[in-house]
A protein has these predicted regions:
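N-terminal ligand-binding lobe of clamshell/alpha-beta domains
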Residues: 1-288
Length: 288
C-alpha cells in the first residue's frame, strides 16, 4: 500500500473505492469528495448529489481529469492499473490503497487522518481498534466457516484476503484458508492435473479465490455458512443447496444470509462488522 502522493491536505477528492467513499464521509471529510463511482452507495443521502464517474473497473478517465481533483483514491484490487496509469499520466496524484488485513485497514484509516489533517477522526478510529483488540484477546471455541463469494462456479477466498482476516478476528476459521485457485478451471474442480507454478500459463495469476465443489464443502464440515449479498447476491433461494449437505451448519440451521460489505469493505464499516459477525459465528459465546 503506497503512501498518499500529496504534501498538503487534499480539498478536491475523487474516490474510486466504495468503502473509502463511505469512510471519508463518516470521518468528517465528505465535503471534500467531488466524484465517486457508480458503486459508491454509502452514505446514501450524501452520495446521491455527487457526480458519478463510471464503475470501479471502467471509470471515465476524461471525466475525472475534468473534475480537477487534487487527489484520486484507488485500490489495487478493485481498480485497473491501466486507469491509474492514465490518471497519473494526466498529472493527477493517485493514492493506491490495498489493505489485506484488519490491521492494515486500521493503518489506512490512520493514514487518511494524517493526509486530510483531521484529528477529529481519532475517537472514531480508536474505538473500533479497541473493539478489535478485545475480540482478538478473547478465548473462542473453533467455529469453522464457509463463505462463498460466487454461485456458478462456486467460489470462495483463502487466507491471503481481507475477508479471511475479518472472519479470523470475529472468531471464525475459514475452512478454505489453505486452498489456492488452480489452473485451468478443470484442475480447480479436481477434473484435471493443475499447471505447475512455473508454467507461463499460471505465472502471475491470482490464486486467492479458488473455485470449489459442494463435495469439498461437505468434506470441510463447516459449522456455519455465511451467504453474502456481494459480490454475488446470495438470497434465501440459495439456502436449500447447502442445507442438503451432511454438515454441522445444515444440521444446526446455521446457514445465514449476511451483508457482504461486512466481510469485504475495509474502512469505517469495520465497526459494523466487528459488532455483527461474532454473533453470527458464535451465538452461544456472545450470549454468555
Amino acid at each position: 500500500m503506497m503512501d498518499a502522493p500529496v504534501s498538503t491536505p487534499p480539498q478536491r477528492v475523487v474516490s474510486l473505492v466504495p468503502s473509502v467513499t463511505e469512510s471519508l464521509f463518516e470521518l468528517g471529510v465528505g465535503d471534500r469528495v467531488i466524484g465517486i463511482t457508480d458503486y459508491c452507495v454509502h452514505p446514501a443521502e450524501q452520495v446521491a448529489r455527487l457526480p458519478r464517474i463510471g464503475g470501479t473497473k471502467n471509470p471515465d478517465v476524461e471525466q475525472i481529469i475534468a473534475l480537477r481533483p487534487d487527489l484520486v483514491i484507488a485500490n489495487q484490487e478493485e481498480n485497473r492499473e491501466a486507469d491509474v496509469v492514465a490518471l497519473q499520466a494526466a498529472g493527477l496524484p493517485v493514492w493506491v490503497t490495498f489493505p489485506k488485513t484488519v490491521r492494515e485497514a486500521f493503518n489506512l484509516l490512520w493514514n487518511i487522518m494524517y493526509v486530510f489533517d483531521e484529528p477529529s477522526m481519532v475517537e472514531r478510529i480508536r474505538s473500533t481498534e479497541w473493539l478489535c483488540d478485545w475480540l482478538e484477546r478473547m478465548e473462542q471455541p473453533e467455529c469453522k466457516v464457509f463463505v462463498p463469494i460466487w454461485s456458478d462456479p462456486l467460489m470462495t477466498f483463502n487466507a491471503d484476503t481481507f475477508a479471511h482476516d475479518v472472519l479470523r478476528v470475529c472468531g471464525g476459521t475459514n475452512v478454505f484458508a489453505d486452498r489456492e485457485r488452480l489452473y485451468p478451471l478443470a484442475a480447480d474442480l479436481g477434473q484435471a492435473e493443475p499447471l505447475s507454478a512455473d508454467d507461463p500459463r499460471a505465472v502471475g495469476r491470482d490464486t486467492r479465490y479458488p473455485r470449489v465443489t459442494l463435495a469439498e464443502v461437505e468434506a470441510a464440515q463447516p459449522d456455519v455458512i455465511l451467504l453474502p449479498s456481494e459480490p454475488f447476491a446470495f438470497n434465501a433461494s440459495h439456502i436449500p443447496v447447502f442445507a442438503a449437505l451432511d454438515i454441522p451448519a445444515a444440521r444446526n440451521q446455521n446457514i445465514r444470509l449476511v451483508d457482504g460489505s461486512l466481510l469485504t469493505w475495509h474502512g469505517t464499516r469495520l465497526a459494523r462488522a466487528l459488532n455483527t459477525l461474532p454473533n453470527l459465528l458464535c451465538p452461544s459465546k456472545s450470549e454468555v
